[in-house]
């Protein structure tokens, strides 16, 4: 996954308090998810959403990405969590906004800050990552995809593997 030719002039500008778009470009349909995250975690200054192959495969399986090795530990000592499946009521009420609330709920239930785990899998959906700027948020999305690829291959080789021992991570 790479961001090629990112052009800030091709990005929509949205007021995070009101949700009003002040540019000519239409914001992403996931904008309400981004806005909820920015409001809940003011230290987050950029959010990236992907449907990368391996991480999204874990999301579609409703599985966290467990920490099997030091490469994962270099990114975070925690598993990359997966939210619970969104309810039918929340889906029909305001899917994108409630997706953001589900991300917040998951992090709070785990007792982990968004910078201890700078990304999450949304069940049956995809990946959201964040950071102090766009470059960091993209790098976090790339790291989650790489870790998911390693975890996938590790599970193929040894399906009943245990997570990395704490003294190594």
Regions found by a protein language model. Name each.
Residues 1-169:
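Glycine-rich flexible loops
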């Amino acid at each position: 996954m790479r961001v090629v030719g990112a052009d800030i002039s091709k990005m929509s500008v949205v007021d995070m308090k009101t949700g009003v778009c002040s540019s000519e470009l239409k914001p992403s349909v996931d904008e309400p998810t981004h806005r909820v995250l920015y409001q809940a975690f003011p230290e987050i200054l950029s959010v990236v959403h992907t449907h990368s192959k391996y991480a999204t495969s874990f999301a579609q399986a409703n599985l966290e990405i467990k920490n099997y090795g030091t490469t994962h530990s270099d990114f975070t000592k925690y598993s990359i969590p997966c939210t619970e499946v969104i309810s039918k009521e929340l889906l029909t009420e305001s899917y994108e906004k409630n997706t953001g609330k589900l991300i917040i709920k998951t992090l709070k239930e785990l007792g982990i800050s968004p910078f201890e785990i700078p990304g999450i899998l949304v069940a049956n959906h995809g990946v959201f990552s964040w950071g102090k700027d766009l470059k960091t948020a993209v790098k976090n999305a790339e790291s989650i995809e790489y870790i998911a690829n390693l975890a996938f291959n590790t599970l193929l080789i040894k399906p009943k593997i245990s997570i990395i021992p704490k003294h190594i991570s």
